[in-house]
Structure formats: C-alpha cells, structure tokens
Amino acid sequence: MDLRFQRGPSGEWKASVVLAFAFKGEDIRKQAQALIDVAPWLDIAPALNDFTGAAGETGVLYGHPKIAIPRIILCGLGERESYTAETLRKSVAAAMQKCRELKLETVGIDVQTLAGLPGDAARNVEEAVVSAYLPLYTYERFRTTRKEPLFTPSWISLFFAEDIDSTLRDAARRGESAAAGIFLTRDLVNGPANLVTPSFLEEQARKLAARYGFTVRSMTRQEIAAAGMGAFESVFKGAVEDARLLAIEYCPRGMEKEQPLVFVGKGVTFDTGGISLKPSANMGDMKSDMGGAGAIFGLFETIGQMGGQAGAASAGFTRRVIGVMPCTENMPDGQATRPGDVVTSLSGQTIEIINTDAEGRLILCDAMTWAQREYDPAVMVDLATLTGACLIALGTDVAAVFATDDALADTVRTRGGDVGDLYWRLPLWDRYFEDLKSDVADMKNVGGREGGTINAALFLKQFVDEGRRWAHLDIAGPAYRNKKSPLCPFGATGFAVRTLMQLALHGVPEPSGD
C-alpha cells in the first residue's frame, strides 16, 4: 500500500473512502466539516445520527457511487477526556480492517482533522499512518489453498487543504517507514525455523547492507569459539546449523569516531531448551526466540526506508547506530552442553550451566562483551525474549526494562510509550545475585524460581563494563502473541522496533548524578 499526499481544496479530494474521527457526545458535523464540504450528502445522511462516537466504533456512510468521495468511515474516539494515542491507533486499525472487508481500493485521511486531535500534530499523523499499515499485515508465503491473497488497498492519501506541511509529511513518512520495519521483523519472527536460520539472518543483513549502504560484519561458529566466547559456544554445540555473530552498522558521515548507540539482540532461531528439553506443547512457538534480533533488523529497515547510509541523517538519524546479533539454535545432541558443565565467557568469568534452557543470557553475555570491546558504546541496550517469568509478572502487553541509571530507564519508558511500546522498570538489586552464586564457578546461569526476570538481568549485568550505560529489555510478553489484536493479526508483533527507532532518533540524555 503506497502513501500519497493530496493538496488542494476539499472539493478536489478523491478516494474510495475517507476516514473521519469523532468524539463521543460532540457534534459530528462540526468535527467533520471539511468532509461535509467535499461530500455534502454526509450532512443529511440518516446514518450519521446513529453514530455515537464510542471508542472503537466504526460506521460506513454511503453517498452516490459516481462522486469523488462516495463513502465515509466514521471512527469513534470515545470521550475526549479519555483520549490517548492508543485510542487513535485502534480506531484507525478498525477502520482499515473495514476497508479490507469492503475491498475499498483507495483511502483518504484529512490531515487537519488529525492535527486537531489532542496531543502533538506530528505524533498524531505518524501514529495514524503506522496504524493504517499494521493491521493489514499478512504472512502467507506457504499458503497454497487460498485462491487470492487478502485484499489490501492500493494507496492511502493524506489530504492537505493548503500547501503540504513538511513537518506533517515527514511524520507520515516516519510512520510508513516504521511499518516497513515492523513488517520485516514480523516476517523474520513468524518464519519457520527451517527457513529462518542463523545463516539466513546473515543473508538478510547483507541484503539490507547492499540496499541501504550499511556495513555488516559476521563471525562463524569456528571464529566465535576461537575468539574465546565459551558461553556462546556452549549454546550452539548441539546444533547442526552454523551459528553467527552479526553486526550491522549505520554511521552518518563525519560520525565515524563517535561513540555509538549499540543494540544487542538475542537471535535464537529455535529453542528446544537443549538437554534441559522444553515440554512439547507449544514448542513450535520457539521460532520466535529471535525476537530481539528481529527487532534490530526492523530498526535498520526503518533507517533504510528513511534514506539509508546516504540520506537518513537528513531525516533525523544523526547518530551512529550498531546492531549486534548473536544467532544460533539451541538443540539437544551428543555434543550438546550438559547441565553442570562449566564454561569460560569472553570476559574471563566462568559460568556453571545449571539449565541449558537459560541459553539467551549465555549468548548475550559474550555478545555484549564483544560489542563493548569492539565499539566502546556510549549506551548499550540489549533486548531479548529472555524469561517466561517476565510474561507471568507483566503479561503480554508490557516488557520489563532494567537500567544502570534513571535517565536511561525513563527514556526507554517515555520514548517507548510515545509509540505504544509499554515498559515497566524492575530493580537491579545486587541482593538477588545471591541466587546466582556457584560453588564451582564465578556464577550459575540460573537461580531459583523466584525473581527469575531480575536474576536474568543481574546475570547480564556482570558482563557490563564499570561505568557503562546499559539497559536490558525483556520483551518475552509482547513480542509474540497467539491471539489477534487490533494492530496485529497473529504471531509476531514487531514490538520494540519503534522503541529502538525513537532511541536512534532522539538519543538518551545524560544521567543526572544518580
């Protein structure tokens, strides 16, 4: 679906349908005056009186099929006092699903209406555009019985009554680019593990680099082992598929010596648990255990869509950004790591492996050490579908954030919340590390059942350089769902792509002495 812009008096607007937004209890005619100008029939449509404006309500109003705007979809926003950006997202998503159902070829939105909603005008436009795309996602690569693909409108257009406002146009482009990044993440995470292997992810990284001018580095399992990444090696020892350590870099001109913002994403393309084998029920969902790496791919697709190496700086991506992705399968095998084995990490610290199903932290700890040595990041953020305990604690809508300083934690929560990615901060209290102490090594890879998400974060903290700014995002809950939501038909959600995008665009303020 293409994004377009139309400029001129409302009488010149053309589309199969136009979306109109209305608050409950307010005069709909006043809220949709621009549309009444272009579609006078709307003012006298009897169905207009049936529309209440309740949150999530949609109503289709029909005019004459030969006129420029033959249909209006009314989108309810609920009470004005209760309005949030999430209200707008769900409203647009519901309307676009109705467009798919009715097979409406072209869709229009009056920008002035969006700009007049509560909140920042550019934010409203960006959220409306990204929300128009996300509910239309499909993954049908392996469907052979459907006679035709699900219908998708050919374009969506933003209507400007006067000159096109460059700020709002750029916001719309950000929304479009964010959707493209999320779609790539969803494709990778939804993809079956016999297709989406570590070597496949390397191919995808190189395609991004070739298309957008990024730089890619890759290490094979032999190189990873030779480098001394014993924790990472312990996970891939049982796998036939070759592991990879991938790094992809975006560096604006003149920023080559700048300390970068580094994201480290867990890329376990299939997780059986290893010798500590998972139950068979729902094991197929473990193809999603590379959601952290998938989000990094989505970020770089977004940067690429905004201009890539050559032009993204003019779109606001003025910081050097690097994504590091340790990628492997976790499989049981005669060569696989056993519970009770002791390995030496790249940092030199030794780890007693109590449970081979706590593998994500093992690949992340070596990748984090490597990233710090190679890139000396100003800020390092790791993200992973790391613990089931996080899902129990926070549910499917909220991710956990841990951070070494308040400014970093607050930035993740605020910037993520701005785009609908919700985070809740959990503590990094050293007292919890007692559960990770080992009698035979420097630490164990798991503690007891209690506080599992905190223990995992504290394990990773042992591999963060003194004074390094670091945040850990446990996205186990919101990264993958087995039920439909307004913005995601099924499976991978693309959670955290827009959080990373926000951090790359706006950076992280310095800590205030905490």
UniProtKB/Swiss-Prot annotation:
GO terms for cellular component: cytoplasm. It is found in: Cytoplasm. Mn(2+) 1 binds at D271, D357, E359. Binds 2 manganese ions per subunit. Mn(2+) 2 binds at K266, D271, D289, E359. The active site is at K278, R361. The keyword Hydrolase applies. Its cofactor is Mn(2+). Its EC number is 3.4.11.1, 3.4.11.10. It holds the Pfam family Peptidase_M17. It is an enzyme of class 3 (hydrolase). It catalyses: Release of an N-terminal amino acid, Xaa-|-Yaa-, in which Xaa is preferably Leu, but may be other amino acids including Pro although not Arg or Lys, and Yaa may be Pro. Amino acid amides and methyl esters are also readily hydrolyzed, but rates on arylamides are exceedingly low; Release of an N-terminal amino acid, preferentially leucine, but not glutamic or aspartic acids. Presumably involved in the processing and regular turnover of intracellular proteins. Catalyzes the removal of unsubstituted N-terminal amino acids from various peptides. Belongs to the peptidase M17 family. This is Probable cytosol aminopeptidase.
